[in-house]
A protein has these predicted regions:
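N-terminal signal peptide c-region/cleavage motif recognized by signal peptidases
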Residues: 4-6
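Periplasmic polypeptide-binding modules associated with outer-membrane biogenesis and secretion
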Residues: 9-29, 36-267, 276, 290-308, ...
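A generic structural motif
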Residues: 106, 328-330, 406-410, 549
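Gram-negative/organellar outer-membrane beta-barrel architecture
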Residues: 111-113, 211-213, 217-401, 418, ...
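Extracytoplasmic gating/loop element in the C-terminal half of outer-membrane beta-barrel translocons
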Residues: 245, 433-510, 518
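Transmembrane beta-barrel strand/turn architecture of Gram-negative outer membrane proteins
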Residues: 398-408, 415-448
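Short glycine-rich, acidic/polar surface loops and turns
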Residues: 493-496, 525-533
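Residues immediately flanking
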Residues: 513
Length: 571
């Protein structure tokens, strides 16, 4: 005999479900309990009436799954603290579909989503009647209609005829899609300097077929543009005369001037500071300006970035970048070099996943250690794919980056070389708890002499984002003064595992390995460590403790230890 016992949702009555003939299936039992959970204990002393109500509730649960000839026996014991109801069920045979007619009419009858849904219709002749599946079919067609702009769609006929004598059912379904609506005009709540940009970011134009995905993507683009404090695009009511849907946009622009201040600390660089000044709006075309000052004891830099959008400012724009950078040699208060640069960058989203950047940069670099001044004109390109789920503290994502830069005396550079950089980072989460982060960074420079390559383009390792036990940019071949001079190749890797220990807090362990030299795999370095990750509204805060694993003849590389503090996931 099958028996089950559980309490109703109101916890005033305890139900025992039994099946003397062992016919009760698990799915049916669960459905009966769902119906009883929603059943309120009647306020009455009339046990006969109470039994009748319980029996009717159980009967409805069985009929929903196609069992119309079940035998239900109800007995009630009200002498206990909580009334106890015993229900014995003999399911009987289910209703079988002997006729099923399903027709789709209207202008959308050959529309692929409707056709796909129609072809997956489960209530075919010979199958068991299931009212849940029947309702799911109806809801699915209406969901498709709303998602793709068939706002006049309706069920012309939807009925089930059950014959208890023959234990059979006939289903009649006729769905009329009506006409498909198109996008109308974009209406902005009040006049904005941003009107042109708001229109340019729309992934549709007037007269295009309506889709709810287009509206969702439009809202994402508007909110990612960094022009607005708040912005929302909402479809108006469908116009049955024009068969169009206008889009209403409400937007509040960001302040004309924004100042951001941030700070960090590592045991090798000490305090770090950043001051950022942003003008989100320069004019009605969406031009913007960002100026950034970064300071630490090793490096100081100023960057000015003027952005000119061409259509959607998230996907298609040009950056003009003016920069100055001053870097000290490792453990040396003397200046290592100064660099002035001017860059042109053309950013374009070439497909759903990949972004392309064409670049041309002019660099003038003064190296005090060699009393040399070099100028280079360097064209190049890069391809980037970035995916993430979870906002500013993602739990899934990856980033792929490939870049090629070329310098040649033929167009006025002081030396000829080319540089290839590749990075691949992956973040994955398992069982909603375990997170793994993998990072691989490969670089190669083809040059006759490393001194022909600007210092800022050579490879160094060490710091917050790779080989964390080692000082910032301290790992590279050494010059005649025993100072890091940069390298022509690099190969770096990281594996990191983190586990939640408290809400918003994760414990991490990691292992970094790498080599930086004029040839691949010349010298190998590695470290291991532990860290704390804290998810905050401003991003992921990382605190790491890293210890080097290799001994070295060079004192500063002999099993170093560093503490680093940073904001943001290194993805």
């Amino acid at each position: 005999m099958f028996a089950a016992s559980t309490a109703s949702a109101n916890d005033d009555t305890q139900y025992h479900i039994t099946s003397q003939d062992d016919s009760l299936r698990d799915e049916v039992k669960k459905n009966v309990m769902l119906y009883l959970d929603d059943f309120s204990t009647p306020d009455t002393d009339n046990l006969a009436y109470w039994k009748k109500l319980v029996k009717r509730q159980v009967s409805q649960a069985l009929q929903a799954l196609g069992y119309y000839n079940s035998n239900i026996t109800v007995s009630i014991n009200d002498s206990a603290t909580k009334p106890q109801v015993t229900i014995d069920i003999a399911m009987g045979y289910p209703i079988v579909i002997h006729q099923s007619h399903y027709q789709v009419t209207g202008t959308g009858q050959s529309f692929k989503p409707f056709v796909t849904q129609r072809n997956s219709y489960p209530l075919v002749v010979g199958s068991k009647l299931d009212h849940g599946s029947y309702q799911t079919v109806k809801n699915a067609m209406m969901d498709i209609a709303r998602a793709y702009g068939f706002f006049d769609a309706k069920w012309m006929k939807h009925e089930i005829a059950v014959d208890l004598q023959t234990q059979s059912a006939a289903i009649q379904l006729t769905f009329d899609t009506g006409s498909r609506y198109t996008f109308g005009k974009i209406s902005i709540a009040k006049e904005h300097a941003s009107n042109d940009i708001i229109h340019a970011m729309a992934p549709f134009k007037e007269g295009d077929d309506f889709t709810s995905d287009a509206i969702a993507n439009y809202n994402i683009s508007l909110n990612q543009s960094r022009y607005f404090t708040s912005v929302q695009a909402i479809p108006a009511l469908p116009n049955p005369l024009t068969k169009q849907i206008n889009i209403n946009v409400t937007a509040v622009n960001r302040p004309r001037n924004i100042v951001e201040v941030s700070a960090g600390f590592t045991s090798n660089l000490g305090e770090r500071g950043r001051l950022k000044w942003v003008k989100p709006w320069i004019n009605r075309y969406g031009h913007s300006l960002e100026s950034e000052l970064e300071l630490n004891k090793q490096e100081q830099s100023v960057t000015n970035n003027y952005k000119v959008p061409h259509g959607d400012p998230n996907l298609d724009y040009t950056n003009y970048v003016l920069g100055w950078r001053h870097t000290n040699n490792f453990n040396d208060t003397n200046n290592r070099y100064r660099k002035y640069s001017l860059q042109w960058q053309r950013h374009q989203q070439i497909n759903e996943d990949w972004k392309r950047i064409l670049l041309l940069k002019y660099e003038r670099e003064k190296d005090n250690t060699q009393s040399a001044t070099r100028t280079h004109l360097i064209p190049g390109f890069s391809y980037i794919r970035e995916r993430r789920i979870g906002g500013i503290t993602p739990n899934w994502g990856d980033r792929q980056f490939v870049q090629v830069e070329v310098s040649d005396k033929a167009w006025g550079s002081q030396s000829s070389f080319y540089k290839l950089s590749m990075r691949s980072n992956w973040l994955r989460q398992f069982n909603e708890t375990h997170q793994l982060l993998f990072k691989l960074d490969v670089g190669y420079i083809s040059a006759n002499d490393v001194n022909q390559v600007p210092i800022s383009m050579r490879f160094f390792a060490g710091g917050d984002n790779n080989l964390r036990a080692y000082d910032f940019n301290s790992i590279s071949p050494l010059d005649s003064n025993n100072k890091s001079r940069g390298a022509l190749t690099q190969l770096l890797g990281t594996i990191e595992y983190s586990y939640p220990v408290k809400d918003k807090w994760r414990f991490a362990i990691f292992h970094d390995v790498g080599t930086v030299g004029d040839k691949f795999l010349e010298d190998k370095y590695s470290d291991a460590g532990i860290g704390i990750r804290w998810e905050t509204p401003v991003g992921l805060i990382r605190l790491d403790f890293a210890k080097g694993l290799q001994s070295s003849d060079i004192k500063r590389f002999d099993k170093p230890f560093n503490i680093s503090f940073a904001i943001g996931l290194d993805l």
